[in-house]
Every structure is written in structure tokens, then in C-alpha cells.
């Protein structure tokens, strides 16, 4: 398009969230895109606009000829949940995450975190939900529970998407919180598919560059690190317990 005010060409106009799936080039309809920042979102490409409550349906690209739709899941408390942990526990989340490192996927003795930080979004939709721990633990276990809750909320949205689309063959992770290897491994375990994390964390900028360049076929994707799924039954069992607690607490 061209701005009527200055006759300056506008090659692309889009929201930051909508360009993330294009960071590695053309849209992969066999993938689900998970961006992990202050909040998180899950995008699952679809050929048509689907009505799939409690998920959202969004248009992420439209050029006058083609339209790309996605099912969208929203998680308000990702990095923000770690900020919540710091305020309420008085412990540095960065230090706790460093201590957790790239270790065990699950701690069966850890409490659960019912994560409604900044409002509980999909698939529960309870804006006034009170975030809280169920059970007691050390500062390290509490931090693990918060990190784990982010993975669990993503998993809950993926489960909803699987009711309307075939399960994805992989997850594509981006955003600042995706730098946490333990979280990426949790997502791989819970989803049962590999998680690909791009080496370039600026997914928004890369996605926009791809669209502005006219979606070139030779667009160079950044190298990825792949996290293969580890079928850790302890983490899967914790997810089911957490899901039951969330449903009870939210009245879902």
C-alpha cells in the first residue's frame, strides 16, 4: 500500500505477534508456533477460518489474494509469572532458574502453581482468577512450579487445538523465555513432538523482514536447536493433576 499523506510505500503492516511465525520463512502448516515472553501465545496455522471456542481465530497475513489464518491460544503469565514469584517470594527468579539449570524434567515433591497472573486466558478465560500455590516447597521448588505452569498452560492450549486440527509435527519456540532449556524440554515432553528453537531470538524482526522482502523463497532461516521429546511420565502425571486443580479452581 501507499500512505495517502506522504506517498510513502508501506510494504507490510502487521502486528508483532502475527509476524513471528514467518521468522524462518514460509508458514509451516504442520507446526505450532509458541512465543514465550512476558506473556505467551500459541499459533496453529489453518487453511480456513475456524470457529473453535475457547480458542481465538486470527488472520496473520492477507495480501489481497491469499489469507493465512491461525488458531490462537493466549497465556498471560509467562515471564510475568516469574516476576510475580519474585514479588511474592522475595527470591531472585534468575538465580533460581540458574540453579534448576537443565536438570530433571519433574520434581514429584514440588507444589503446583495455579497461574492466573495478569488474568487467566485461554482455554479457561477467568480474568479475575487468583494465582496461588497448591502445596508447600522450597524457593527452588516454587520457582520450578511457576516455570512448569507456563509449559502446562501451553499444553492445555495445544490440547484444545488438537480437537480441531491434526496434532502438530513440531513446535517452533521463540521469545526471551525460550532461552530456558528446561522449559523447552518440558514442552517437548508434554507435546510429544520436537521443539525447534531458533538461534536468532528476534523472531518479530525476522518475520517482518521476510514479509517486507516479498516472502522470497531463498530467505535464510536461522539455525535451530532441536529438543527431542522425552516421555517422562512424572511430568505428564503432574500435568494431569495440575489440569484437574485448574479446572476445579476456575469452575471450568
Q: For each predicted feature, which ranges?
A:
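Active-site core segments that coordinate phosphate-bearing ligands/cofactors
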Residues: 2-174, 179-252
Amino acid at each position: 500500500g501507499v500512505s495517502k499523506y506522504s506517498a510513502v510505500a508501506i510494504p507490510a503492516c502487521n502486528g508483532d505477534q502475527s509476524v513471528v511465525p514467518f521468522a524462518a520463512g514460509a508458514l509451516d502448516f504442520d507446526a505450532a508456533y509458541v512465543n514465550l515472553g512476558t506473556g505467551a501465545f500459541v499459533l496453529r496455522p489453518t487453511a480456513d477460518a475456524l470457529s473453535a471456542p475457547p480458542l481465538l481465530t486470527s488472520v496473520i497475513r492477507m495480501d489481497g489474494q491469499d489469507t493465512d489464518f491461525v488458531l490462537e491460544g493466549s497465556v498471560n503469565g509467562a515471564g510475568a509469572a516469574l516476576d510475580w514469584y519474585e514479588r511474592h517470594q522475595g527470591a531472585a527468579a534468575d538465580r533460581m532458574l540458574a540453579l534448576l539449570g537443565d536438570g530433571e524434567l519433574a520434581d514429584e515433591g514440588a507444589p503446583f502453581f495455579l497461574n492466573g497472573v495478569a488474568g487467566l486466558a485461554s482455554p479457561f478465560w477467568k480474568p479475575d482468577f487468583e494465582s496461588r500455590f497448591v502445596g508447600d516447597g522450597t524457593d527452588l521448588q516454587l520457582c520450578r512450579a511457576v516455570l512448569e505452569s507456563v509449559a502446562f498452560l501451553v499444553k492445555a492450549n495445544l490440547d484444545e487445538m488438537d480437537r480441531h486440527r491434526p496434532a502438530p509435527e513440531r513446535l517452533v519456540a521463540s521469545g526471551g523465555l525460550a532461552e530456558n532449556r528446561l522449559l523447552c524440554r518440558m514442552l517437548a515432553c508434554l507435546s510429544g513432538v520436537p521443539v525447534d528453537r531458533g538461534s536468532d531470538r528476534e523472531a518479530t524482526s525476522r518475520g517482518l523482514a521476510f514479509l517486507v522482502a516479498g516472502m522470497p523463497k531463498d530467505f535464510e532461516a536461522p539455525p535451530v536447536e532441536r529438543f527431542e521429546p522425552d516421555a517422562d511420565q512424572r511430568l505428564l502425571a503432574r500435568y494431569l493433576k495440575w489440569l484437574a486443580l485448574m479446572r476445579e479452581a476456575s469452575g471450568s
